[in-house]
């Protein structure tokens, strides 16, 4: 009951915040339209309680740490049974809190054990006009028609070893017509782009560092990519265990990478790199790990990576 109360309180808060945001913009991915948690909206509530600044509250069954995403009047999120055997998509009406869809998407025969710090529904969905893509890590990815809830396509082959006790957390993102997903497990590490209409693979690029030389718990990561400028175009800056990469978002070709000593990079507070002009700031993981900063190289791979290790203290 305590965990359900926390889930409800969090959901009510996010609804109230995004209710104002959505008047001028769609909150279509993890941490909003720009991926950095910022909004141009004003007049957002600064405090709330059970009786203050709450328009509605809707119970969400089971457990899930995914953030809601909003398009129009729809709010989508995911949830899963505590042991991960059943995975669900939830949609509610933004204005009333009324349940629109409660869809059982996947059954999982043998989910890996996780701790209470994670759930089997932690990755945040991504949404655009008419489609929502919901990702559960190795356990499945689905694209739904937002009006009917009909399943348009699924993928259950993006498999990796999420590590016993850890579980999935990397959220998908949309880059033009592709859904980009990180698959960074203990056994395999790659980034993949799927056609958002068909779900077919557009490109798939293995991580180029030699992960077999790293301790096994340094290979896992929980991140998502961000777009950064590169000349007149863009590059996809992609954090992983022990490294930070950049790829051509159209072809998946690796443009550059830098190696660092951070590991277990996680979306707390930022599951994607923070891009500031030509500079990238990336959290290197939990405990006393290094937090690399570097240049988001505009002209391709540099002769010498311009990296600055900014700190070694544990950060939230």
Where are each of the predicted segments found?
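Bacterial N-terminal signal peptides that target proteins for export
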Residues: 1-11
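Bacterial N-terminal signal peptides
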Residues: 9-20
């Amino acid at each position: 009951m305590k965990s359900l109360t926390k889930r409800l309180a969090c959901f009510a808060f996010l609804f109230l915040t995004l209710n104002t945001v959505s008047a001028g913009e769609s909150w279509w991915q993890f941490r909003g339209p720009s991926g950095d948690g910022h909004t141009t909206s004003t007049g957002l509530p600064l405090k709330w309680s059970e009786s203050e600044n709450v328009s509605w509250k809707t119970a969400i069954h089971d457990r899930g740490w995914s953030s809601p995403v909003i398009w129009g009047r729809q709010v989508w999120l995911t949830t899963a049974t505590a042991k991960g055997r059943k995975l669900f998509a939830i949609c509610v009406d933004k204005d009333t809190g009324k349940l629109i869809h409660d869809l059982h998407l996947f059954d999982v025969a043998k989910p890996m054990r996780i701790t209470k710090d994670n759930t089997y529904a932690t990755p945040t969905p991504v949404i655009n006009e008419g489609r929502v893509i919901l990702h559960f890590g190795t356990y499945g990815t689905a694209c739904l028609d937002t009006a009917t809830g009909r399943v348009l396509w699924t993928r259950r082959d993006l498999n990796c070893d999420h590590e016993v006790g850890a579980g999935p957390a990397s959220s998908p993102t949309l880059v033009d017509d592709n859904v980009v997903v990180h698959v960074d497990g203990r056994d395999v590490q790659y980034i993949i782009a799927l056609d958002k209409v068909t779900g077919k693979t557009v490109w798939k690029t293995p991580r180029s560092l030699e992960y077999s030389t790293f301790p096994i718990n340094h290979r896992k990561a929980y991140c998502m990519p961000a777009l950064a400028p590169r000349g007149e175009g863009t590059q996809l800056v992609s954090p992983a265990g022990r490294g930070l990469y950049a790829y051509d978002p159209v072809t998946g070709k690796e443009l550059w990478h830098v190696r660092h000593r951070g590991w277990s990079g996680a979306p707390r507070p930022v599951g994607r790199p923070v891009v500031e002009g030509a500079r990238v700031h990336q959290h290197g993981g939990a405990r006393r790990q290094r937090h690399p900063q570097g240049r988001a190289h505009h002209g391709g791979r540099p002769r010498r990576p311009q990296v600055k290790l900014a700190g070694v203290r544990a950060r939230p």
